[in-house]
């Protein structure tokens, strides 16, 4: 993938520059969300499957419940933090 030079971007009209910036910001936001999901899933998987050998391609009921609970707690916490920051 080639990168755009500063000169190439500056030669665009204002509307095109704005559209490119919005696209880049959108892609960065998507990347952050995907990274967070990956980190939460990894952390919760390690928490819920600590010291257990992987014996199947599927989760048992206890593992599934633990993962759901772990992820929901993180989501709830993040929502509360965002709400608190927005309230300031």
From Swiss-Prot:
Leader peptide range in chain numbering: none
Pfam families (alphabetical): zf-Tim10_DDP
Entry GO CC: mitochondrial inner membrane; mitochondrial intermembrane space protein transporter complex
Disulfide bonding pattern of the chain: 44-70, 48-66
Organism (species): Candida albicans (strain SC5314 / ATCC MYA-2876)
Family designation: Belongs to the small Tim family.
Keywords: Chaperone, Disulfide bond, Membrane, Metal-binding, Mitochondrion, Mitochondrion inner membrane, Protein transport, Translocation, Transport, Zinc
Motif (Twin CX3C motif): 44-70
Identification of the protein by name: Mitochondrial import inner membrane translocase subunit TIM8
Localization per record: Mitochondrion inner membrane
Membrane topology: Peripheral membrane protein
GO molecular function, one term: protein transporter activity
């Amino acid at each position: 993938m080639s990168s755009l030079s500063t000169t190439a971007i500056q030669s665009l009209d204002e509307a095109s520059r704005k559209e490119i910036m919005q696209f880049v910001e959108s892609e960065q936001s998507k990347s952050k969300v995907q990274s967070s999901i990956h980190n939460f899933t990894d952390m919760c998987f390690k928490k819920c499957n600590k010291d257990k050998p992987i014996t199947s391609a599927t989760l048992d009921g206890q593992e599934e419940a633990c993962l759901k609970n772990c992820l929901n707690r993180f989501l709830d916490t993040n929502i509360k933090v965002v709400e608190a920051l927005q309230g300031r």
